[in-house]
Amino acid sequence: LETIKVSVRTVPSMSELISDQKRMTDIQALSIDDILPGARITAASVKNAATRSFLISGAGGSIGSEITRQILLNNPKIIILFEMSEFNLFKIERECRVIMSSENLSTNVIPVLGDIRDTENLKHIFSSYSIDTVYHAAAYKHVPLVEDEHNIAKAAENNILGTFNIAQAAIQNNVNSFVMISTDKAVRPTNVMGATKRFSAIIIQSLNDYNDSIKFSMVRFGNVINSSGSVIPLFIDQIAFGGPVTITDKDVMRYFMTIPEASN
């Protein structure tokens, strides 16, 4: 097949065609969901979502956007999409509108261009809405970029001070719960990114010890397949440009979880 450059595509199932969910023209490139068993999962159930308001920082990123999708399907009162990238914010807000239309949802989706390093902006947003839960997914996480001597200070400012800023805003505005998305690289860190996330974890643990009004927690993900900057998109790009496909060691073994699994 390699010699004749065959492309692999997926076509809709017979049940999807019969039920008019899809058409024969809906041919798509092969995705991770088609290969991995269990990659497609049901959205997480959120208690009392209809009366709750959520803020997701880094809402346009790989993890933040999936958290947004899963919460949105519970039809919450408000979702605030807090995102530094204009393009990513545009994409996730547009996707939310499509989901709301197809699922007949009534959530108030509020897109906010913001930076967790900007304390005044955080104060304004948190004081403007009665936020119940924060999912803090905003971070600089690309190890080689963060490791560069020109970027270390900005990475620390964003990942450490930014986390402190948004956590303080949550405390000052009586948020009920705050969940920080972290990484296994924060365990005995060997690089700058891991060190900044470890520092952030210490901040969250300390704030949780001294604040009874808000529940702080965090989750540490391992390798998330197909997230931005991970090896799968890199391999796809390398193959598309004719190679070579680069790995750190010929005997390396990695374990992955999918973005929906991690977010769920």
Identify what each model region corresponds to.
Residues 97, 168-171, 192-264:
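NAD(P)-dependent short-chain dehydrogenase/reductase
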Residues 71-78, 174:
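Conserved S-adenosyl-L-methionine
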Residues 2-53, 171:
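Flexible, Lys/Arg-rich cytosolic regulatory linkers and terminal tails that connect or flank
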